[in-house]
Amino acid sequence: MGPGPPAAGAAAPPRPLSLSARLSYAVGHFLNDLCASMWFTYLLLYLHSVRAYSSRGAGLLLLLGHVADGLCTPLVGYEADRAAGRCVRCGPRKAWHLVGTVCVLLSFPFIFSPCLGCGPATPEWAALLYYGPFIVIFQFGWAATQIAHLSLIPELATNDHEKVELTALRYAFTVVANITVYAAAWFLLHLQGSPNVEMARDASDQLGIQDVQVFQNLSLLVIGVGAVFSLLFHLGTREGRRPQVEEPDENRPLLAPTTARPLLLWRHWLREPAFYQVGLLYMSTRLIVNLSQTYIAMYLTYSLSLPKKFIATIPLVMYLSGFCSSFLMKPVNKCIGRNLTYFTGLLVILAFAAWVALADRLGMAVYAAAVLLGSGCATILVTSLAMTADLIGPHTHSGAFVYGAMSFSDKVANGLAVMAIQSLYPCSLEICCRACMGFYRWVMVAATGGVGVAATLCLCSLLIWPIRLRSWDPGAQP
């Protein structure tokens, strides 16, 4: 006899996401990625070299952005979890994504535009006060979009392999966003150059007030392209609705049997060891990725003394290698599992760190080193996001808080790390001296190899104590 028909009350197995649904989700963070690439790469350069603000003033605006982002991220995550589908047209995650997108669209162009009403006699502090509110609004919107988009992964994915695929596609579009920004910046600066070749060699390499229009046009291009992809996300992504609690009537018993799954609240996460294990691993991953991205240009320029074209070509090679490796995440995770996949990425990054430490001059081999760094960073970033989704599991109602807490630790750790590195800078002048030539080399070694060792220790803890909830008792009272 064959198996009987399914029980009447049995739930149908969830249908896997279609290709269009996966791609629609993946482009939902494209606007954030475009803005983040321009923010991290060009903000200090724009404020200091183009707008001629002091290094301290430009640094204060960047610090304000990090503080605002760090504070808004967990708060947005907590509020997103509290939302109970009040939006009629979309779910609570997409509603927060829409709010964040609007804030980014309205504020980001003003950050890379001249101060309205400011003149040559306007004091610097007044101009900084002008930019401050736009930066805070932008960082709030960026955090809301990021947390809402990340917390949709456990909601949409029906199995572990779909989680990896969604994070891999998300990272692939992050790479495309970075390539788009760098290519557009090169094109706009090329158009700004002088038709006289000899004059271009002297003038086009120096940024100044004449390049204000370049950055303003670049920010408008970023906003326009990002808005189109955000619209595609909202049109093609459907968030699952949470069942509403039915109102009791006079014919229903007051003491009905309880069948609903107990909720895992944010305060329960704080008592879970796995929450801190995955948090430390995610923080270490972000330190490797962000610090290497921040200091790779300094390393190429001052430690290796390479021409300026390498500042554009090497990051491009890094992102292209990361783009290609991101598509291998699903089959690799399926074959060897999360932990070994992450460890493989760490081995590639440690190989890059050893190469940089042992070789004074890389020459053209720097392209091969860039491939190692880009593919390794993509591997550990995608896998760490998949591990975070594993930690959340079916408890998607508090997933935004988990992602918010992870991002908060990431922002704080990166800010403190950059401050520590800058405080150790050996040159008292802005012009690089002989002492700083080796300084940036060892910064790259520490940012990749040193933090990579710390990430290895975090991974070992997950091998000993796998990702699962240990302290939460579903039968206990909240």
Swiss-Prot record:
Q: Name one Pfam family in it.
A: MFS_2
Q: Which reaction does it catalyse?
A: L-cysteine(in) = L-cysteine(out)
What InterPro entries does the database record attribute to this sequence?
A: MFS_2, MFS_trans_sf
Q: Which residues lie on this side of the membrane: Lumenal?
A: 48-56, 119-124, 192-216, 308, 360-361, 422-444
Q: How does it sit in the membrane?
A: Multi-pass membrane protein
Which organism encodes this protein?
Canis lupus familiaris (Dog)
- Hey, which family's this protein in? Belongs to the major facilitator superfamily.
Report keywords, A-Z: Acetylation, Amino-acid transport, Lysosome, Melanin biosynthesis, Membrane, Transmembrane, Transmembrane helix, Transport
What is the protein name for this chain?
Major facilitator superfamily domain-containing protein 12
Which residues get modified to N-acetylmethionine? M1
Q: Record's GO cellular component, any one?
A: plasma membrane
Extract the coiled-coil ranges from the record: none
Which parts of the sequence lie on the Cytoplasmic side of the lipid bilayer? 1-26, 78-97, 146-170, 238-286, 330-338, 383-400, 466-478
Name one process (GO BP) from the record. Answer: pigment metabolic process involved in pigmentation
